[in-house]
Every structure is written in structure tokens, then in C-alpha cells.
Design a protein with these regions (language model features):
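Single conserved hydrophobic/aromatic residue that forms the stacking wall/gate
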Residues: 1-12, 212-214
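Structural recognition of alpha->loop->beta junctions
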Residues: 13-16, 76-78
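Non-cysteine beta-strand/loop elements that form the S-adenosyl-L-methionine
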Residues: 16-23, 82-83
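Ser/Thr-centric signal marking residues that sit
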Residues: 28-29, 213
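Alpha/beta catalytic cores of nucleotide-metabolism and tRNA/nucleoside-modifying enzymes
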Residues: 34-59, 63-211
Length: 215
């Protein structure tokens, strides 16, 4: 799979819509503003609205595993924006620090107080405020474990996407949309999809256990 990245130096005009309000791991917009649609539903709805139009979709946020990448493309996205999955790498912003022998890196949302104070406040129409207490944040600040070089993560994302394409017989990215089929699953079905009935003894770079208590 050829790796195509969008960088800040891109300056070619194109018709693109960025889809995603609140799916990010450090975004609180859905709770603070009450705005947002589950990411896959949002992508599918926008793709349906853009039927027969030559407009590309960038899916922004909500990627936790490489399988989420495949699902977003299957739902109608042409490109994917990711943040938390790359947080903690050498290439990501943020200071490194150590807690109880573990190395972490700072990670904050664009809507967090710290980021707004550093310059992102204009994005949320709050540039006029100089006092931090006047900000109404739509993101949080936190830490993630240090992950090393980003190339390892990109390799796993490519591998997972390639595997997904193989399962559904997609020879290229366009065929993912044609060959994929979405079905609804229950809480039990989701639990079955995850690692269960065992205590993991060794970490794997492309999987992290999630809590089921909120389901």
C-alpha cells in the first residue's frame, strides 16, 4: 500500500470536507457543547450527501486501532486524520518526563486551556480572552507512554489495513468501499471481538486493552 501523507507544505487546491466533531481521545466538544455524531455514522451521512460529487472526505479522529482506519475508509472516507495514535512518538510535540520509571510525553487537545493559551483560541472564537479563566475549553491535557519512532506505528497501520483489504478481497483502497459491509453488533459481540478470558503477559504494539465498564 503506497503511503500518502498530507503535510503542512501542501498547497494544491482541491475540494475536500473534513468530517469529525468530538471523536478524538482528548476532545470534550460532545460533552461541553453537545455537538457531534459518532464518527462512522458521520462519514456515511456525508458521503451519502456528496453522492455523484467529486468532493473528497477526510475523516478526523476516532482511530484507536488499524481496524478503525479500514472502517473509516469503508464508510466513505478518502483520507484519515489521526492524533492520539501518534502521540508519545519522537516526532510528536510535547515534553518527555518520567514517572515511577516509565517515560511519558505530554499530549493536549487543540481545545485544551494550555493549547488555547498558546495560540489555538482563535479556532474556538475566544482569541479576545487573555485570562485563562475566561476560556471555555473543548479539550483536555494529559500524558501518554513514550512510543519511540513513529515509523513502527505507521508500519502496523499499513499492515492492519492490508490485512483488512485481504479479508474482503479489495485490491485497492477504492474497492474497500465497494466490498465492505457494515453490520450492527451487540455488547456481547463487541466483547467477543476483544481479547478476553486471559491476562495479557506481553504488550503488543498494535493492540491495547479497553475497559468494558462504560458499555
Amino acid at each position: 500500500i503506497p503511503l500518502r501523507l498530507v503535510g503542512s507544505e501542501m498547497c494544491i487546491r482541491d475540494s475536500i470536507i473534513k468530517v469529525g466533531i468530538g471523536p478524538g481521545s482528548i476532545c470534550t466538544t460532545r460533552m461541553v457543547a453537545g455537538i457531534g455524531v459518532p464518527q462512522i455514522s458521520a462519514i456515511k451521512d456525508v458521503r451519502k450527501a456528496l453522492k455523484n460529487k467529486k468532493i473528497k472526505i477526510i475523516s478526523d479522529g476516532g482511530i484507536k486501532f488499524s481496524g478503525d482506519l479500514a472502517k473509516a475508509l469503508a464508510a466513505g472516507a478518502d483520507a484519515i486524520m489521526m492524533g492520539s495514535i501518534f502521540a508519545g512518538t519522537d516526532e510528536s510535540p510535547g515534553k518527555k518526563f518520567k514517572i515511577k520509571g516509565k517515560i511519558y510525553k505530554q499530549y493536549r487537545g487543540m481545545g485544551s486551556i494550555g493549547a488555547m493559551y498558546s495560540g489555538s483560541a482563535n479556532r474556538y472564537s475566544q482569541k479576545k480572552f487573555k485570562d485563562k479563566s475566561k476560556f471555555v475549553p473543548e479539550g483536555v491535557e494529559g500524558r501518554v507512554e513514550y512510543k519511540g519512532n513513529v515509523s513502527k506505528i505507521i508500519y502496523q497501520l499499513q499492515g492492519g489495513l492490508r490485512s483488512s483489504m485481504g479479508y474482503i478481497g479489495a485490491k485497492n483502497l477504492d474497492q474497500i468501499k465497494k466490498n465492505a459491509k457494515f453490520i450492527k453488533i451487540t455488547k456481547a459481540g463487541f466483547y467477543e471481538s476483544m481479547v478476553h478470558s486471559v491476562e495479557m503477559t506481553q504488550k503488543t504494539i498494535n493492540f491495547k486493552s479497553v475497559s468494558y465498564t462504560h458499555l
